[in-house]
Design a protein with these regions (language model features):
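Short, small-residue-biased leader/transition segments that mark boundaries at the very start
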Residues: 1-6
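Aromatic- and glycine-rich peptidoglycan recognition patches
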Residues: 13-18, 80, 97-102, 107-142
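Structural motif
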Residues: 88-90, 111
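Conserved catalytic core of Hanks-type protein kinase domains
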Residues: 32, 60, 107
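Catalytic cysteine-centered active-site loop
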Residues: 36-87
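Post-signal-peptide N-terminal segment of Sec-exported extracytoplasmic proteins
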Residues: 8-46
Length: 142
């Protein structure tokens, strides 16, 4: 909530504390996976879904184990304000109804995030984009 002063915010996990390193790791992951098609339940080059991409990124780049499903990823860590986002924070969207209508990505920098988009596969998008701004749900720090 907006009445929390920033000193009360949780620091990121130690593995995510150096933003420069985190951004480099996310860029590397994006270049390795960019264009991989979206496939629900997928966890491979043949196709990956949004929470699978997040899980693999945190496992392979930060040695952190996250839950497999978006709805479970939305319960870990601490909710933070959108304007407090740091590289490696998770961004969640409600793009439809019910649990299948949830979407997750990883905040990068400059108001951008990397994710497995249903229409274009693994890519970088902007939080300023009308669609993502309209459907933004919450941000979480791991």
């Amino acid at each position: 909530s907006s009445d929390v002063c920033s000193s009360d915010l949780p620091p990121p996990n130690p593995r995510l504390s150096d933003s420069i390193t985190v951004i480099a790791s996310l860029n590397d992951q994006l270049s390795n996976w960019r264009g991989t098609p979206y496939r629900y339940g997928g966890m491979s080059r043949g196709g990956v879904d949004c929470s699978g991409f997040v899980l693999m990124t945190f496992r392979d780049k930060f040695d952190l184990q996250l839950p497999r499903e978006t709805r479970m990823q939305a319960k870990i860590g601490t909710e933070i304000d959108k304007d407090e986002l740091l590289p490696g924070d998770l961004v969640f969207f409600k793009t439809g109804s019910g649990e299948s209508g949830l979407h997750v990505g990883i905040y990068d920098t400059d108001n951008q995030f990397i994710h497995a988009s249903t229409s274009r596969g693994v890519m970088r998008s902007s939080l300023d984009n009308v669609y993502w701004r309209k459907n933004f749900w919450q941000a979480r720090r791991i």
